Amino acid sequence: MLRIITQQADVKAELQRICDRTHDEQVLHKEATVREVLQAVKRQGDKAVLHYTDEFDNQILKAEELRVTGSELDAAYQQVSQELLEAIQLASRQIEAFHRQRVPKSWVHFGDDDIVLGKRYTPIDRAGLYVPGGRAAYVSTVLMNAIPARVAGVPRIVIATPPGAQKAINPAVLVAAQEVGVQEIYRVGGAQAIAALAYGTETIPKVDVITGPGNIYVTLAKKLVYGNVGIDSLAGPSEVLIIADEGANPVHVATDMLAQAEHDPMAAAILFTTDPALAKNVQVAVERQLVDHPRRIDTEKAIAHYGLIVLVESLDAAAELSNEFAPEHLELEVKDPWAVLPNIRHAGAIFLGYSTPEAVGDYLAGPNHTLPTSGAARYASALSVETFLKHSSIIQYSQTALNKVAGAIDALATAEGLPSHADSVKRRIQQDE
């Protein structure tokens, strides 16, 4: 059952327990398996990818079957409803419109003495997007990862996603990929997919950045290949924190909590409220909705282990506790969310008001739903166009400008014991003279 505790209880310790749920010994023990997979793929390429696809996904593939064919891509459109296709297209338009507003611009500044300083943004060459399989067809994951990469101008975007029964990829995933311009899709999942994207194989290209969520094996693999390639983040199980007052609808709050819990048995769903009646009503509503929930077993586990209702003294107190937890998703289900918002410092995405459930942001509002988890919102942000861009500094000095700073550079280089640094300036000054 969903627990109710008061702020006077050891709330911070309980929140820390939930935040640390991916750091237990059982999870860390899996790192050895992931290291083995990474090394095998690095050494053996396609052979290892095929071996682990058989072992972990129970699908026997040949190397030539790794890439989804053009005929499979075409056939996918016949297997999705017109309603779903139109929803994908609507979401694509809105996500693209938002991300196009966030493209950073290169710039240069022309200063005194013909000094030119600036910053130049360029896209990476190749992006690898991981799309989970298994529990659902993660159409939104395709959109939220591929669209920012495309807007950034990445010339080659590839998707890796695990094969299902009979080697099939969910047609909705294939349609979503094509709608956002991705035709290169590989049927490979898990740590072996991350290894293939990081190191390259005979069939799967090595990429520059890997993005997209996955299970603990995928997350550990991304952690271990970081440095060889860039990654978006180390995504843990999903989480929502709801701050609600007496005006919130308990059935709506309960549904929002279950919407998070249904993701994964380790997902977290937390409510902070000033109203004891709301707390009790939400507790009852959660139990009622669980009775015939299609994902009852996993959802019930998440609620039992990582679900929590905390009675707080004030909305200010709720905001401060929220900042310590730094949730992936934060819902402000209060009468005046704009009054609470200034007190929020750490959250991946913030949903304002009674009519803005997290699902709006998950699917089509526009902002990215790939967000920092497990407290990482204290220092990290959502996936964005900049995930797929690099920036280079632009510097040009005239001889006049160099002459003016030569003494300072000489002093700094000498202090650091780097004589050739100093000489690289002094010889240009001598040459000018």
UniProtKB/Swiss-Prot annotation:
Cofactor detail note: Binds 1 zinc ion per subunit.
Catalysed reaction equations from the record: L-histidinol + 2 NAD(+) + H2O = L-histidine + 2 NADH + 3 H(+)
Record's keyword annotation contains NAD: yes
InterPro entries: Ald_DH/histidinol_DH, Histidinol_DH_CS, Histidinol_DH_monofunct, Hstdl_DH
Residues that bind Zn(2+): 260, 263, 362, 421
Keywords: Amino-acid biosynthesis, Histidine biosynthesis, Metal-binding, NAD, Oxidoreductase, Zinc
Catalytic site positions: 328 (proton acceptor), 329 (proton acceptor)
Name of this protein: Histidinol dehydrogenase 2
Natural source organism: Nostoc sp. (strain PCC 7120 / SAG 25.82 / UTEX 2576)
